[in-house]
């Protein structure tokens, strides 16, 4: 399971270290806001007016209020996946290609 967290841990750690405000969307649609105080394999401690322990299995999406650098040690690896400008165009083109094939 350590391989699966090679992107998650550096991302959450950067959000925690830089105290970036985040919106966390749960699978039931509820939106939580605050700063990540700490996290482990199963939970994120989210601090706003109160601290909330949020179980990761209930989380759909974590949205930072600003871009965060979370580079890992692997050169040229998948560490830049967060940048919006690089990912927006190819995914829309790919979905259009699949529509044309039908």
UniProtKB/Swiss-Prot annotation:
Transmembrane segments: none annotated. GO terms for molecular function: RNA binding. The keyword RNA-binding applies. CDD domains: Hfq. GO terms for biological process: regulation of DNA-templated transcription; regulation of RNA stability; regulation of translation, ncRNA-mediated. Keywords: RNA-binding, Stress response. Signal peptide: none annotated. Pfam families: Hfq (PF17209). Residues 63-102 are annotated as: Disordered. GO terms for cellular component: cytosol. It comes from the Bacteria. Residues 70-96 have a biased composition (Low complexity). Residues 9-68 form the Sm domain. Belongs to the Hfq family. NCBIfam families: Hfq, PRK00395.1. RNA chaperone that binds small regulatory RNA (sRNAs) and mRNAs to facilitate mRNA translational regulation in response to envelope stress, environmental stress and changes in metabolite concentrations. Also binds with high specificity to tRNAs. Homohexamer. This is RNA-binding protein Hfq.
């Amino acid at each position: 399971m350590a391989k699966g967290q090679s992107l998650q841990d550096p991302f959450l750690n950067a959000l925690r270290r830089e105290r970036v405000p985040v919106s966390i969307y749960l699978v039931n649609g509820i939106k939580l806001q605050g700063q990540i105080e700490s996290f482990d394999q199963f939970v994120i401690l989210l601090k706003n007016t109160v601290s909330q322990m949020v179980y990761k299995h209930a989380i759909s999406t974590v949205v930072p209020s600003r871009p965060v650098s979370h580079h890992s040690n692997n050169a040229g690896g998948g560490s830049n996946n967060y940048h919006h400008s690089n990912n927006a165009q190819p995914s829309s083109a790919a979905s259009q290609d699949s529509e044309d094939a039908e």
